């Protein structure tokens, strides 16, 4: 009794402390559970400031043609959860920052209370599936998955029809940004939990046991034999997005023949490309553009829906009698001639060509995520939980690039066979469905013997670089993507052991030389003196798209480029005359990237102008070229290893370049420092970032092994960055190896409107207390011999007060230190006699470009 009373007394005395401790333990348990669900495969992904890790050696297997990698993080897309920085080394000082996370979803989402209306519909069994999916086997709600219309505001008052359990489903509901998407996810999960979504079994009609995987070898002797019977005709399905219209035209020019048909789907987000393709199609009777458009995201169910709808269109187009369906993207290119392809298919007119992953089906199912439930909405593929593969069939897959017979396409589109209907239902909720749907249907259909395990393509897989989970912002999975071909890969294009007629991927902004080599190999050289063979232009802004697609940084830069160019025209001979003075009118009408010999040459800005003297408005094109900024400083063997030192944004780890080619960045951007190295002795280098007022923003070490080619790191700097010229120094034992400068652009626009003084006061002031990191590195200023900051600090303070013309003058002056005017031309007649017509120059986007110009059909039915 005494002991019991003593215990009770202790409990009463410390009950508050005990309750607090229990609450903390409970909270920690919930946090651990939440992290395990959201970031199961990405430990350490905690927030914006992180300890860096070594470069990822790449994930995914070496299966031949599958894009799937492994299960990825389901991190936030629109909240504060970011992917980890890829790091080549370790910071000088470890920085830890607390991260404010959004409130996590509760463990369970309770169902909505049942309505009191007596006529409540009971969604169960097949009726439930039809209510959600629709009779055609696809989701209703218009074009669910293709994101029709503007997203609705987030509203957490959606009403699930069941109690939702499972970490994946709860994570998806917590991260979805619109009520519409949340409701769709809840509907799908409830049907799945009730067992009413997925088919339990699917009938198999193939008479062969096991997996069918025959192949065909390339035989030069047989290829030379004449074709018996009529030659086949091909329906090419071109699935394109982006803005690379010149590369698309070059592809079409290479594959075009008047006996074939070309059907082009342009992603709904690519309006500039759509306008260009519609204009192109008007000149050829056998080229058409889909009258409908979808948003086809990587790995999404919408891609399969697009293919099936396109196939139906092609079957029902009057006068289009074709024998084979071949899908291509704008990054493909032929490796053999049209004559060779037609002869080969004519000799194999009853075969379907699809590339399989191999023979390890269980591994493929896991790697591809076929045993997981996915749903597409808000341009994202959400992982919602696990599911079972239907019994009774062989599941196969591999590449989503294929060559299919018309009879098989008719079977897939028109049949009422339960095999196809139920597989459509299954693949509506599948990641990368186009990589498996046609394989699985064919291998279980009566036509299974027509399968050939070859899609007639060669793909440039480098999984060490291509499997870096670069699609985690689009899909809750880690996927892979092939690399672009370069001249050193040309031997891979010359396949001799198996028939290949196309290759991918090619990008002219990455390397155009390999296309020149391949084009010459197929069709011979262009006539001597043909212009622009080494030039490439790509539009990145068009007035018809409106300024909504431009960031404030780009809007600031493009308008400043126009002012700088017009000032140049007014002050530099031979243009420096009264009739060559112009004022810009409105925003630029277009902007192009310009490359020559696979090197970025700058921006081409087209601008409407008004002559200062009397006269009508004119349109000029201006060429702004970046200045070389790297300064090699060392003389040792280690210093000679440094090839380049760059700072930019939009780092592409697969191609190891900045997709922001001009390196334009503003105060709210998060720059990356990248170094390229030649082979040589191991070294450890220190990277130091210095802002315009000589504040040492950060410093960290990188380890460079003997065979390292590229190192890069994005330091987690506090924002906003101070505008002006920054310096990045590379040192070894505090002795200089190299140095570069980059510009943080002062913004003249904020939210597409002229910058106001109250916005400039914080946007251009740098981080609070000049603290870019939680730990100060200012102690390094003496070692680095930096000047005293007092004078530049006062100038920086005055800059925070600038708006209007004074702000534009500051912005123009900063840009002029990094960019120079390389050319100026007139699109039409000009009051300035010294201005050359753009079409007569070699650099203008309006200059001749024969390799990407289609022209009339020649006597042999071709364009090239």
Swiss-Prot record:
UDP-alpha-D-xylose binds at residues 239, 267, 296-298, 400-401, 481, 504-505. Residues 53-65 have a biased composition (Basic and acidic residues). One of its GO terms (biological process) is glycosaminoglycan biosynthetic process. Keywords: Disulfide bond, Glycoprotein, Glycosyltransferase, Golgi apparatus, Magnesium, Manganese, Membrane, Metal-binding, Secreted, Signal-anchor, Transferase, Transmembrane, Transmembrane helix. Active with either Mg(2+) or Mn(2+), but activity is highest when both are present. Residues 39-123, 136-158 are annotated as: Disordered. The keyword Transmembrane applies. It is a single-pass type II membrane protein. Pathway: Glycan metabolism; chondroitin sulfate biosynthesis; Glycan metabolism; heparan sulfate biosynthesis. Contains disulfide bonds. It is found in: Golgi apparatus membrane; Secreted. Disulfide bonds join 162-190, 206-448, 467-480, 469-478, 580-832, 825-838. It catalyses: UDP-alpha-D-xylose + L-seryl-[protein] = 3-O-(beta-D-xylosyl)-L-seryl-[protein] + UDP + H(+). Its cofactor is Mg(2+); Mn(2+). The chain crosses the membrane at residues 16-36. Its main location: Golgi. Residues 73-82 have a biased composition (Basic residues). One of its GO terms (molecular function) is magnesium ion binding. The keyword Heme does not apply. Its EC number is 2.4.2.26. Pfam families: Branch (PF02485), Xylo_C (PF12529). This is Xylosyltransferase 2. The gene is Xylt2.
